[in-house]
Amino acid sequence: HACTGYKTVLFFCCLLFWAPIMGQKKLADAPKIAPALLIKDLQTLHKILKQNHPSIYWYTPKDSMDFYFSSALASVKDSMSVWAFKNVVASYLAKIKCGHTSVHFSPKLTKQYAKYRFPQFPLQLKVWKDSAVVIGNIYTRDSVLKRGTIITAINQLPIKPLVDSIYGIMSTDGNSINFKSQVLTNNFSSWYKARFGDADSVYQISYIDSAGNSKTSSIAAYVPPKPKKDSLSSTTAAISKPKLPKPAVPKKWTLFIDSSANTAFMRVTSFSGSGLRKFIRQSFRTIKTSGVKNLVVDLRENGGGNIKNSTRLSQYISDHAFKIADSVVASNRGISKVPFSNFFNVVYYALAKSVISKKETDGKFHFKRFEKHYYKPIIKNHFDGSVYILQGGYTFSASTLFTSPLMNQKNITIVGEESGGGYYGNSAMMIPKIKLPHSQLLFRLPLYRLVMDKTRPKGGGVMPDVLVDPSSYAIKQGFDIKLETVKKMIQQKN
């Protein structure tokens, strides 16, 4: 997966770049907050969710959510660091089963906790189902735990319960775990530390060797080397040492025409960005001019973005008029129970809701535009050939809105894994960040629930027409198994 490879390189580059800058401390030394204040934050969070979240009881009934809230309160028995408290909040929010409802450090907290970044778990792992495979190792000379090695346990804890434990503090749409597995893959080291802390100086790694035998190896936690005391020699070294080039950041959107394969390859990693509509328009003009009969749209790295952009891409491919959703509803007209300190964080959203929402007979406040308006196909440079949509666990939010009107179209084939974004619907519209007053944690609060098609079963993601799971062999060999599958399909058809 190109996304996974780039993010692994970027992660380790950041690790090495930040390592020598500041002295590192263990999480156990982080400042603590009194339990009474943390409980107040939980109560504030609970009130805001009950009053404003449109999908708080969509997958989890009220009595269960109340039980999880009581459990969260009970877990705050003593003073806690913000790092530890974040897990309490994350675990509670995860029970809502909404991928757009999550908790994060504020910029101020991120800066404060930079000094607790190390030690770190040294491996990056690709995780799916009950499998984990090495895709990166900070110790590049390690000849044992190298790319493609299957990991079966860490510190004697088997991969499945270990991963399930981390999933407990991650949010996703419904019951699908594919989004969680891809987010975990993108930054395994940080998620491992978030869940299990940094008390270990050495990790026991159980793995399968090249002969298929179960083995165990030790690997040290990564601790950055301390800067040399001789500042003069450090300065001299800094001047004489050539600067390493930063890894090139890949473009958000790319188009490649392979005339020999009669195929256009379009990679869209986000539906955000002011230049996307222009890219889409120019791409389909180029595709039309080239005359290719196959189009591959790669959404495996696409976590969502602007609905107008995803809709525009659908219009160039859909053979029929479509609407975005059967229903788009909010619980109220404004935003209630939010601390006054968040006024500037929410005022825009509250005003926008009051303008676009209309109360209906069901007592909910509806955004009628997306419920009633049908978007017609764009005729000029419309693509009528065979379309292959590549998707995976990180295909989320607006990406599933792009796919939604295309799913039953005869010339469309979805290839890959179940999407991370919901098949039935999501809560992806208008998401302010609310700051909890005592911990200073930020949580994302969706304001609208969007149901794409009320006749669909809820709880899972968009299922592919052709399932292609990850493979330890493909990871070891470094080839893109999903893209190669599509290329073979096109070759066989041609």
Predicted segment positions?
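Conserved acidic, small-residue-rich alpha-beta core segments centered on
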Residues: T149, I307-I475
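Flexible, low-complexity junctional segments that flank or bridge functional domains
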Residues: Q24-L295, L299-V329, Y423, A428-L436, ...
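Short, well-ordered alpha-helical microsegments
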Residues: P20, L276, A398-S399
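Bacterial Sec-dependent N-terminal signal peptides
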Residues: H1-A28, L45
